[in-house]
A protein has these predicted regions:
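Bacterial N-terminal signal peptides
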Residues: 2-17
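Aromatic- and Gly/Pro-enriched helix-to-coil junctions and flexible linker segments
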Residues: 16-122
Length: 122
């Protein structure tokens, strides 16, 4: 019985930790695959194809102001993050990914981005 009473708090802590990590959005697991498919073609490593001077594949660059002066990702502040504004806008001239890319994000993917930024974009 003593072993069970000692093991119970460890088991509960483990279950709570698992629930917390399932709700935590992770860049490499959740966001990078979406960005690789929809963002990095225009905002990745190749300076010849990079649009707007914005590089999203390097965190430090994504946190800086771009050519427009807007900051792509403001950790903890999705409403101030240009990426979030562009994902959710109804303006066809501003929406990202743009029409020419022939890429789209689902509502669930957009919300995942919002949660990731709100959680600190780590």
């Amino acid at each position: 019985m003593r072993v069970l009473s000692l093991a119970a708090p460890v088991l509960v802590a483990g279950l709570l930790g698992a629930a917390e990590s399932a709700d935590t959005v992770r860049f490499n697991r959740d966001i990078r695959p979406i960005m690789s498919d929809t963002c990095f073609h225009c905002h990745g490593f190749d300076p010849k194809s990079r649009k707007g001077g914005l590089r999203l594949d390097i965190r430090e660059d994504a946190l800086k102001a771009g050519k427009s002066g807007a900051i792509a990702i403001v950790p903890g502040k999705p409403d101030e993050s240009e990426v979030i504004k562009r994902l959710f806008t109804k303006d066809e001239d501003d929406v990202m990914p743009n029409k020419e890319s022939h890429k789209t994000l689902t509502a669930a993917q957009k919300e995942l981005f919002r949660r990731w930024v709100a959680q600190g974009a780590v």
